[in-house]
């Protein structure tokens, strides 16, 4: 089989302005590593649990205390999950408390040429801060930050730590560096194994 890469469009659901990323990853990437790519590309801090949902099948980190949980994402590739479920699009849930749901669409598959590491192609919109309270908390956060007369403006500004937060602007260079750093880390590990 010829190695291939896949372009994914990742959209954070239930937020405005739109938060979207386009990434390229090896089709054989383990879902646990895809989670890491999404964390870097979105700007999340990998502080919470996650789960991929393909049709009615969940992939994440199993918890023995919960019995029937998700299939172990560390043992399943994106390719095998897609083949097994027939999914062409799927969901990625991050932070079960805040409930950040992402819609992921497989846009295109290409033969791998050269590097097979993850790449960030496009970034639109600023990822919400961690622990802001999900889509509804984020909406309130943006309203309070934008309005100096808002009763929670000062508190939100202090919590955010920045007065120049722009929900519409993605810091592409910072996000791209985070994805590139992952690719470099994984390449070093692969070289050490050979």
Curated annotation (Swiss-Prot):
Task: Work out whether the entry's keyword set contains Calcium.
Answer: no
InterPro entries per record: MM3350-like_sf (IPR024047), Plasmid_pRiA4b_Orf3-like (IPR012912)
Q: Which family does it belong to?
A: To A.rhizogenes plasmid pRia4B ORF-3 in virA region.
Q: Which UniProt keywords apply?
A: Plasmid
Query: What's the protein here called?
Result: Uncharacterized protein y4hQ
Does this entry carry the keyword Protein biosynthesis?
no
């Amino acid at each position: 089989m010829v190695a291939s890469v896949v372009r994914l469009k990742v959209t954070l659901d239930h937020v405005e302005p739109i938060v979207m990323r386009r990434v390229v990853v090896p089709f054989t990437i383990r879902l646990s590593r895809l989670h890491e790519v999404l964390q870097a590309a979105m700007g999340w801090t990998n502080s919470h649990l996650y789960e991929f949902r393909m049709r009615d099948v969940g992939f994440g980190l199993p918890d023995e205390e919960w019995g029937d949980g998700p299939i172990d994402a560390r043992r399943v590739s994106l390719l095998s999950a897609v083949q097994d479920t027939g999914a062409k699009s799927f969901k990625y849930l991050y932070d079960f408390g805040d409930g950040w749901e992402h819609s992921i669409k497989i846009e295109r598959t290409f033969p791998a040429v050269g590097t097979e590491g993850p790449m960030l192609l496009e970034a639109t919109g600023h990822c919400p801060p961690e622990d802001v309270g999900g889509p509804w908390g984020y909406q309130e956060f943006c309203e309070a930050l934008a309005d100096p007369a808002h009763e929670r403006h000062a508190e939100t500004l202090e919590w955010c730590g920045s007065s120049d937060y722009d929900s519409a602007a993605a810091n592409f260079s910072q996000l791209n560096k985070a994805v590139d750093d992952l690719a470099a880390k994984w390449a070093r590990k692969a070289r050490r194994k050979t």
